[in-house]
């Protein structure tokens, strides 16, 4: 999950994909490791490919574990989510080698519940919001130690 902390209010990059029924699903960027990549390296590469944004991993947010079916096969998937701070790039789907994303958008935190298709990704957003709020409180306490 990539957040642009420089924008106020803070915004999160979401991608839109077409599901097998041809319906648009808005979701967090994700993908699978290539070669000997670490999970963090995979997250940063996938964010860059699917959104055009370069990032820096702040913390792990949790995992989502689910099953889906394709003809004659059930597939188990575990997605490791990280809170990633945007540090450069430009929002674009042009770099997506799989051309899975059909759109990308910066979405304010208060609109994510409505925009995200999957409830389990809303849980990840909640964990990110808690982390960012705690970090803001810590930063404020350091700035004003009284």
Model-based region annotation:
Residues 11-13, 39, 60, 129:
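A generic structural signal for ordered secondary structure
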Residues 1-28:
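N-terminal strand-loop-strand
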Residues 33-123:
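Unchanged
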Residues 27-30, 73-75, 94, 110-111, ...:
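Short, charged/polar low-complexity linear motifs in solvent-exposed/disordered segments
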Residues 24-27, 102-105, 126:
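A short, polar/proline- and glycine-enriched secondary-structure boundary/capping micro-motif
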């Amino acid at each position: 999950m990539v957040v642009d902390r420089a924008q106020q209010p803070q915004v999160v990059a979401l991608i839109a994909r077409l599901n097998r029924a041809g319906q648009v699903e808005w979701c967090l960027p994700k993908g699978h490791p290539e070669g000997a990549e670490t999970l963090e390296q995979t997250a940063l590469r996938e964010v860059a490919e699917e959104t055009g944004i370069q990032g820096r991993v702040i913390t792990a947010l949790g995992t989502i574990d689910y099953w889906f079916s394709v003809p004659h096969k059930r597939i188990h998937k575990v997605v490791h989510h990280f809170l990633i701070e945007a540090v450069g790039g430009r929002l674009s789907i042009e770099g997506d080698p799989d051309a899975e994303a059909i759109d990308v958008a910066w979405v304010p935190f208060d609109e994510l519940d409505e925009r995200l298709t999957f409830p389990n990704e809303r849980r990840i957003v909640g964990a990110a919001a808690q982390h960012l709020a705690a970090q803001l409180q810590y930063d404020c306490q350091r700035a004003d130690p009284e």
